[in-house]
A protein has these predicted regions:
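Bacterial N-terminal signal peptides
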Residues: 5-16
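Secretory-pathway glycoprotein ectodomains that are cysteine- and/or Ser/Thr/Pro-rich
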Residues: 20-302
Length: 302
C-alpha cells in the first residue's frame, strides 16, 4: 500500500499451518512456555484482582528451523546460549459500535470523530475484506526498542518497498522503548485501512523487530519513513531465527478492555499478570544478543 491514505497493515510471514487438537502433553508444554516466557515477566497486580476464567494457548505453528548459513560446517561452535523469547501481538478489527458495547471498547478515530468504532480481537490467520480497518497492539517482555516495517504483498509473492511505520514522532513522540507489560498501539489515534491501488494486492507484510539498543541506521521522522530495501533484507538475513506461534484459546471476538485501553491508548499504566494477554504469541528461538524479528500476516480476500 505504498504510503496509503492511512491504510497500512500488518505483517506477512505466511505460516503454513494445520490446526489440530493438542494432546495433554502438548498443552502442558505450551502452558509452561507462555507462562514462564511471557506472563511471569509482567509485574503482579498491586491489589488483589477477581479470579478470572482459566486461559491457555494452542500451538498453531511449530518451530520453523532457520535456514543454514553458508559454510555452516566450517563455522566455529556457538558459544552463546540459544533460548526462546516471546513477542505478543494483538490484531484488532474495527466494526461499527453497537449500543450494548462497553464504553472502554469504543474508539473515536482521529480522521472521523463523529463515528464510534469497537475493537475486536482476531487471530493472525484472519482473512480481511478490502476496506477493513485494523489496529495493532504489541508487547515485548524483553527490555529494548521496537521497530515496525510495512510492505504490501502481491499475489505473485513479491513485496513493495519497505516503510518504517513505527516509531514516528506522531506516536508517543518517537518513544519506542518496550518492556514487559508496556503496550505499543499502532497507529496512534487512527486505524490502518486495508486498500491498494494495485489489482494484485494480497495484503500486508509487517516486520516487527525488538532490539536491545536503538538501530543506528534508522532516523525517526514525523511520519512514515521509506527504508532502503537492501538494509531491510540484510536485517532479515542476519536476524533470521526459528519461530513458533501460539493463539489464545477463546480470544477471537473479544473486545478491548479498560486495562488494555489505559495501557495502550493512554499509556497510563502497564499490564499485569491479572490483565488480558495478547491474542497471538510469537516465540523466537535466538541468541540473547540478537534482535527479535518476526513477521505477522494481514491477508486479503482474493
Amino acid at each position: 500500500m505504498q504510503v496509503l491514505w492511512f491504510a497500512v497493515a500488518c505483517v506477512g510471514l505466511i505460516f503454513n499451518t494445520t490446526v489440530c487438537a493438542q494432546d495433554p502433553a502438548q498443552e502442558e508444554d505450551a502452558r509452561r512456555l507462555w507462562d514462564s516466557e511471557f506472563l511471569k515477566k509482567r509485574a503482579e497486580a498491586k491489589t488483589p484482582a477477581p479470579a478470572r476464567k482459566p486461559m491457555g494457548y494452542r500451538r498453531v505453528a511449530a518451530k520453523k528451523p532457520a535456514p543454514a548459513k553458508p559454510n555452516a560446517t566450517d563455522a566455529k561452535p556457538a558459544i552463546e546460549a540459544v533460548e526462546g523469547e516471546m513477542v505478543g501481538v494483538t490484531v484488532w478489527r474495527l466494526r461499527a459500535t453497537k449500543t450494548a458495547d462497553a464504553q472502554e471498547s469504543r474508539l473515536l478515530l482521529e480522521e472521523d470523530e463523529k463515528s464510534e468504532w469497537t475493537l475486536e480481537r482476531v487471530e493472525s490467520e484472519t482473512v480481511f475484506a478490502p476496506g477493513d480497518r485494523v489496529r495493532l497492539s504489541i508487547e515485548s517482555p524483553r527490555n529494548g526498542y521496537l521497530y515496525v516495517i510495512d510492505r504490501e504483498q502481491y499475489t505473485d509473492g513479491t513485496l513493495s518497498n519497505p516503510h518504517l511505520i513505527f516509531p514516528t514522532l506522531r506516536n508517543r513522540n518517537g518513544d519506542n522503548s518496550v518492556k514487559a507489560g508496556k503496550v505499543i498501539e499502532l497507529p496512534g489515534k487512527s486505524a490502518f485501512r486495508l486498500s491498494s491501488l494495485r489489482e494484485d494486492y494480497a495484503g500486508e507484510a509487517l516486520t516487527v523487530i525488538v532490539t536491545e539498543q536503538p538501530l543506528a541506521d534508522v532516523t525517526v521522522g514525523e511520519r512514515i519513513v521509506k527504508l532502503d530495501p537492501a538494509l531491510v533484507a540484510r536485517w532479515e538475513k542476519q536476524w533470521n531465527a526459528s519461530i513458533e506461534r501460539f493463539e489464545l484459546i477463546g480470544g477471537a471476538g473479544k473486545t478491548y478492555t479498560k486495562a488494555e485501553r489505559e495501557a495502550g491508548q493512554e499509556g497510563s499504566r502497564v499490564l499485569t499478570q491479572e490483565d488480558e494477554l495478547p491474542q497471538t504469541l510469537y516465540r523466537v528461538v535466538a541468541a540473547r544478543s540478537n534482535p527479535l524479528l518476526i513477521t505477522v500476516p494481514l491477508r486479503m480476500k482474493k
